[in-house]
Amino acid sequence: MAGLRQIAFYGKGGIGKSTTSQNTLAALVDLGQKILIVGCDPKADSTRLILNAKAQDTVLHLAAKEGSVEDLEVEDVLKVGYKGIKCVESGGPEPGVGCAGRGVITSINFLEENGAYDDVDYVSYDVLGDVVCGGFAMPIRENKAQEIYIVMSGEMMALYAANNIAKGILKYAHSGGVRLGGLICNERQTDRELDLAEALAAKLNSRLIHFVPRDNIVQHAELRKMTVIQYAPESQQAAEYRALADKIHANSGQGTVPTPITMEELEDMLLDFGVMKTDEQMLAELQAKEAAAAAQ
């Protein structure tokens, strides 16, 4: 596995992490790279756009059907999609039952033991990042993923999740080789979003790898179960994903040990950028509205 790059995309649920990762990986394969995607999100939507299909059967689902994971063959769980990209979904239990992270651990061990990592240039883990619990931290903790890319936006909860993920990376950075590759901002058109993303990246001792502009063509492609790279290869949005892929490809060995900030520092930063308002500002705005209404 010499030369194998193991990267991971982390981010809060609903941030567009799976869409961003699949579009980026589709652009990477166009650079001549051989890729294996390991979906580590219980929604099992990490490979849908690459396979042009509904969510594929997961390792945990198939293992339960066959009796145990030892009863499976790699061919049972691995599907091949756009330009030869290999796809696996680890899956998770029913909501409220058991640890979804266990599926991640089971899947990665099974794939490694059965040669799925042979003959690929990249293994990409697509990981839920609202919580960095034991199972979801597994690609970091077990030194599987060496480069972590955090997908975020200018929204407060996305920034909060990004900082939390940085804490998880820091915890294992010194015992293993894991590093923060950078932040990817998926534009939500919030106030001063680019400035805020760059400021957070700097505070985390990292950099903003790419700012992905919002474009409805992403949704149009998703409705057809396709990446933008496949659906509209000549579009400006496809060019954005190619630029992101180029930056990740050139980023080998450039990752950093992150420096997460406190909740107070995060809130101060949001206040500085005018994203979060002080009680005094909110009261002044309310009084101004009431005065304007009274004057009518």
UniProtKB/Swiss-Prot annotation:
**Enzymatic reactions:** N2 + 8 reduced [2Fe-2S]-[ferredoxin] + 16 ATP + 16 H2O = H2 + 8 oxidized [2Fe-2S]-[ferredoxin] + 2 NH4(+) + 16 ADP + 16 phosphate + 6 H(+)
Modification(s) after translation: The reversible ADP-ribosylation of Arg-102 inactivates the nitrogenase reductase and regulates nitrogenase activity.
Going by the UniProt record, its keywords in alphabetical order are: 4Fe-4S, ADP-ribosylation, ATP-binding, Iron, Iron-sulfur, Metal-binding, Nitrogen fixation, Nucleotide-binding, Oxidoreductase, Plasmid
Name the coenzymes or cofactors required.
Answer: [4Fe-4S] cluster
**Free-text cofactor note:** Binds 1 [4Fe-4S] cluster per dimer.
Query: Which Gene Ontology terms describe the biological processes this protein takes part in?
Result: nitrogen fixation
* Binding-site list for [4Fe-4S] cluster: 99, 133
Q: List its EC numbers.
A: 1.18.6.1
What PROSITE patterns does the entry give? NIFH_FRXC_1, NIFH_FRXC_2, NIFH_FRXC_3
The Gene Ontology terms for molecular function here are: 4 iron, 4 sulfur cluster binding; ATP binding; metal ion binding; nitrogenase activity
Q: Indicate whether ATP-binding appears among the record's keywords.
A: yes
The residues the record assigns to binding ATP are 11-18
Record-stated family: Belongs to the NifH/BchL/ChlL family.
Q: Quote the function comment for this protein.
A: The key enzymatic reactions in nitrogen fixation are catalyzed by the nitrogenase complex, which has 2 components: the iron protein and the molybdenum-iron protein.
Query: How does the annotation summarize its subunit structure?
Result: Homodimer.
User: What HAMAP family does its record include?
Assistant: NifH (MF_00533)
Q: What is this protein called?
A: Nitrogenase iron protein
The scientific name of the source species is Sinorhizobium fredii (strain NBRC 101917 / NGR234)
